């Protein structure tokens, strides 16, 4: 039986297990046979047949919640993904391999957590409690890093051969604990809430705002603490205390700010089966566009993760830019403003028209950063790279949300994290560490050595960006075929 609309005034019928009824605006319901899911392409066709416009009115509270929770969540992720790298590099002289291991362990923790909590939030039909409760615990876990200091470690582990090695291990372990709470709140619940609260008419614009937050968070964190001496343990105590406290307070604010969406939980009762729902061959076969887009997104993020864990160290140590924030900050602001408007290109022109220029900017930025070291040219290269990075995040993010099956947003956040975090978080930093294996080293004051990141990380990232096209070309053909069938 083919999908059809049940019009207002008709009694909502009951169908055999596996078949679905999905609510549409103006009291309409969409019936789908067993095994089919209401992806964006199906919904768009059905809406056009009855003259409906897919338009979600997002109020001021929605956008306020979007900006606050997205920004503060990304501030916390910046502390983990970039500041922890600087933290263990400065305090414990961690190697590139240790940094790579930390990023990989965090990626695994994020993926497992998102699969578990995403499916759980779908089962009980609640997002708000996971967002707010998660942010509260997230803040406490960040605060705990204020106590990971050499003097504390030496007092607690007097028999340890190397307090620095213990410090690196503790940071990696606590990073995974922090990731559990952060992924529960942000990756699983908050991102599912965004999918529930938007549709294909405004996802590009919303993703434009959401995608610019990671770099705005970098600006907030590194700009806010620019005057601090990162070689002093007291500095990190202050940083972790402030960030942890802010995240905790936002968790409290969320109880008053976030509107709980009404979710359909019928069909989501089998929790443990739903954890792996998105990995079933039948589900993959029913949503091919979603999974091909996710694969392209994974390769895109591998390219980013090759250089991103070492980017600040490259500016600071390799290029000798002590005030790198003064160069990095304007590039972030301009790239964020660019992305806020660029997301609308996806809404009005579609995926193909939006993703190709974004990738072109990203690759051009890599080329400039690889060949040049002067401050002015590095700024231009950084701006191009950041514009391409943020625009790409917005476009891929909107595309994946559009093709997420309705009523399964929580379950499918795990798949999104596989493409955005797990695969890139393991492969990307490992490639970066391999590229930097024979990098120059410097001798620290205590006799230990530290590596110096070099421009080869951008060359490796460029190669990965070229590889995106191997997936992107088939994806664009699939979209063109869908469009011709819908016409």
Describe each region flagged by the PLM.
Residues 111, 204-226, 417-429:
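Glycine-rich segments within core transmembrane alpha-helices of 12-TM secondary carriers
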């Amino acid at each position: 039986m083919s999908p059809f609309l049940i019009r207002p005034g008709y009694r909502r019928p009951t169908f055999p297990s596996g078949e679905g009824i999905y609510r549409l605006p103006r009291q309409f319901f969409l019936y789908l046979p067993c095994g089919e899911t209401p992806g964006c392409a199906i919904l768009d066709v059905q809406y056009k047949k009855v003259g409906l416009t897919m338009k979600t009115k997002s109020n001021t509270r929605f956008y306020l919640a979007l900006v606050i929770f997205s920004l503060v969540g990304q501030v916390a992720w910046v502390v983990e993904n970039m500041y922890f790298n600087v933290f263990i590099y400065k305090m414990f002289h961690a190697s590139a391999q240790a940094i790579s291991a930390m990023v990989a362990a965090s990626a695994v923790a994020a993926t497992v957590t998102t699969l578990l909590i995403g499916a759980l939030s779908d089962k009980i039909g609640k997002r708000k409690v996971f967002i707010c409760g998660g942010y509260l615990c997230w803040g406490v876990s960040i605060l705990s890093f204020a106590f990971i200091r050499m003097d504390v470690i030496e007092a607690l582990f007097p028999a340890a051969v190397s307090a620095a090695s213990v410090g690196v291990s503790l940071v990696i372990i606590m990073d995974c604990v922090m990731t559990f709470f952060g992924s529960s709140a942000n990756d699983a619940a908050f991102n599912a809430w965004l999918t529930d609260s938007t549709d294909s008419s405004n996802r590009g614009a919303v993703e434009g705002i959401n995608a610019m937050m990671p770099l705005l968070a970098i600006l907030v964190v590194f700009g806010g603490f620019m005057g601090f001496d990162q070689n002093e343990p007291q500095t990190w105590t202050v940083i972790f205390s402030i960030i942890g406290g802010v995240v905790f307070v936002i968790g409290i604010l969320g109880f008053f700010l976030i509107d709980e969406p009404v979710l359909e939980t019928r069909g989501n009762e089998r929790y443990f089966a739903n954890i792996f729902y998105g990995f079933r061959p039948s589900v993959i076969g029913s949503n091919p566009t979603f999974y091909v887009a996710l694969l392209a997104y994974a390769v895109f993020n591998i390219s980013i993760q090759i250089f991103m864990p070492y980017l600040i160290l490259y500016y600071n140590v390799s290029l000798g830019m002590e005030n790198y924030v003064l160069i990095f900050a304007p590039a972030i602001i301009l790239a964020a403003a660019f992305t806020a408007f660029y997301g609308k290109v996806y809404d009005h022109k579609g995926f193909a028209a939006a993703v190709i220029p974004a990738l072109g900017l990203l690759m051009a930025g890599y080329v400039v950063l690889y060949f040049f070291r002067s401050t002015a040219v590095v700024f231009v290269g950084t701006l191009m790279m950041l514009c391409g990075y943020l625009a790409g995040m917005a476009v891929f993010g909107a595309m994946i949300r559009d093709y997420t099956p309705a009523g399964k947003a929580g379950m499918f956040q795990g798949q999104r994290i596989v493409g955005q975090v797990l695969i890139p978080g393991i492969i990307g930093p490992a490639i970066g560490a391999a590229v930097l294996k024979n990098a120059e080293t410097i001798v620290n004051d205590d006799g230990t050595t530290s590596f110096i990141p070099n421009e080869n990380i951008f060359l490796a990232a460029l190669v990965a960006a070229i590889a995106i096209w191997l997936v992107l070309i088939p994806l664009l053909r699939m979209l063109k075929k869908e469009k011709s069938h819908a016409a």
